Amino acid sequence: MDYATAIGGVAMFTLIIMGLVAIILAARSRLVSSGDVTIHINDNPENDVVTPAGGKLLQTLASEGIFLSSACGGGGTCAQCRCRVIEGGGSILPTEEGYFTQGEIRNHMRLACQVAVKQDMKIEIDPEFFDVQKWECEVISNDNVATFIKELVLKIPDGEEVNFRAGGYVQLEAPPHEVHYKDFDIAEEYQDDWNNFGIFKYVSKVDEPVIRAYSMANYPDEKGLIKFNIRIASPPPRGPDGIPPGKMSSWTFSLKPGDKVTVSGPYGEFFAKKTEAEMIFVGGGAGMAPMRSHIFDQLKRLNSDRKISFWYGARSIREMFYVEDYDQLEEEFANFEWHVALSDPLPEDNWDGYTGFIHNVLLEEYLKDHPNPEDCEYYMCGPPMMNAAVIDMLHSMGVEDENIMLDDFGG
């Protein structure tokens, strides 16, 4: 090969490479958005947002101080960040289709966490999201109230207020972290169970921020704080190896007084109906949180004269909490009563109250002799199996879904 031929070959190769680079850059300019776009919200120019293109709609709105509900933190699994994307959102993705009916899809319903912001958009969101705020709160206390449940109490910043309705929830944000269960502050009376189940051995390591939703246990007149009942989500004791512990619950169990926690909210759908119907609350485990919020709100803030009862299921006396609170309410308000059923009472409990699963106790001890159970309103929050059993029982008694209110978070 002579020198001229070699030079020509190099030149041709260089031209080919430059041509490919030009094609890639041209394609990238068409596929990757850049510059600013305008998001028109709720057909109100005052709500317009001008923002850089390129992110997802959920995070883009959050960067502008508009916090849509997202218990999974934008992972596409909770389906809470529902909104209507009228223009500019492209076609619905397969990851979204399972969360909507065909009618909702035709009405342009989308999950904000799955919608890419590439061009000017026209969307509709719940007006309540404009009232959602974010605070850096401080841990007041984080004490065991049951074997695997802690009551986390946060102080909101001075001068701030969480304008929520009973039954509402907020989102907690955990930073990347590594926590060791052996470092948890667990009350002495519960440590034997933690040792027996081998829970202290776990480590939770999280490399990115985590967001989860938790129902509030306080009611609106308990101001200046936010209260939660959080159950540790440790791997099942007889499950396969390698199951990681819950990211958020592990972090919250590690919190100590003085620690900072980022909170956004309030959100909610699990609200009391404004009727005069009898209210029957059914709870179990950490599902206590919205039950407490609702019941205290009805009796102490609203001075409701509606007939109200609370039916709570626990394993043993050790798993009962807020007992003095409810006993005091029962003494103070003639229209309120509460009942506990223990599914597995310990010999030392010397328990002479109801035993068994709470849905069976509610049926046998109250509803089967109730003149009109279908006219009552039922509010429930607890473990999934409890929720399903209660709903099946209510359906068998002719209770319509419109009178069954379920909070899926607290259990």
UniProtKB/Swiss-Prot annotation:
* SUPFAM superfamilies named among the record's database cross-references: 2Fe-2S ferredoxin-like, Ferredoxin reductase-like, C-terminal NADP-linked domain, Riboflavin synthase domain-like
The UniProt record lists the FAD-binding FR-type domain at 132-273
Q: Which UniProt keywords apply?
A: 2Fe-2S, Cell inner membrane, Cell membrane, FAD, Flavoprotein, Ion transport, Iron, Iron-sulfur, Membrane, Metal-binding, NAD, Sodium, Sodium transport, Translocase, Transmembrane, Transmembrane helix, Transport, Ubiquinone
**UniProt topology in membrane:** Single-pass membrane protein
- Which GO MF terms are attached to this record? 2 iron, 2 sulfur cluster binding; electron transfer activity; metal ion binding; oxidoreductase activity, acting on NAD(P)H, quinone or similar compound as acceptor
Give the protein's function.
Answer: NQR complex catalyzes the reduction of ubiquinone-1 to ubiquinol by two successive reactions, coupled with the transport of Na(+) ions from the cytoplasm to the periplasm. The first step is catalyzed by NqrF, which accepts electrons from NADH and reduces ubiquinone-1 to ubisemiquinone by a one-electron transfer pathway.
Q: Which organism is it from?
A: Psychrobacter cryohalolentis (strain ATCC BAA-1226 / DSM 17306 / VKM B-2378 / K5)
Q: What does the record note about the cofactor? A: Binds 1 [2Fe-2S] cluster.
Which GO BP annotation is one of this protein's?
Answer: sodium ion transport
Q: Where does [2Fe-2S] cluster bind?
A: 72, 78, 81, 113
Name the gene for this chain. nqrF
Q: Where is the 2Fe-2S ferredoxin-type domain?
A: 35-129
Localization recorded for this chain is:
Cell inner membrane
InterPro entries associated with the record: 2Fe-2S_ferredoxin-like_sf, 2Fe-2S_ferredoxin-type, Beta-grasp_dom_sf, Cbr1-like_FAD-bd_dom, FAD-bd_FR_type, FNR_nucleotide-bd, NqrF, OxRdtase_FAD/NAD-bd
* Subunit-structure text: Composed of six subunits; NqrA, NqrB, NqrC, NqrD, NqrE and NqrF.
Instruction: Quote the cellular component terms of the Gene Ontology held in the record.
Output: plasma membrane
Which reaction is recorded as catalysed by this protein? a ubiquinone + n Na(+)(in) + NADH + H(+) = a ubiquinol + n Na(+)(out) + NAD(+)
What protein name does the entry list? Na(+)-translocating NADH-quinone reductase subunit F
Q: Tell me which family the UniProt entry assigns to this protein.
A: Belongs to the NqrF family.
A Pfam cross-reference name? FAD_binding_6
* Record-listed E.C. numbers: 7.2.1.1
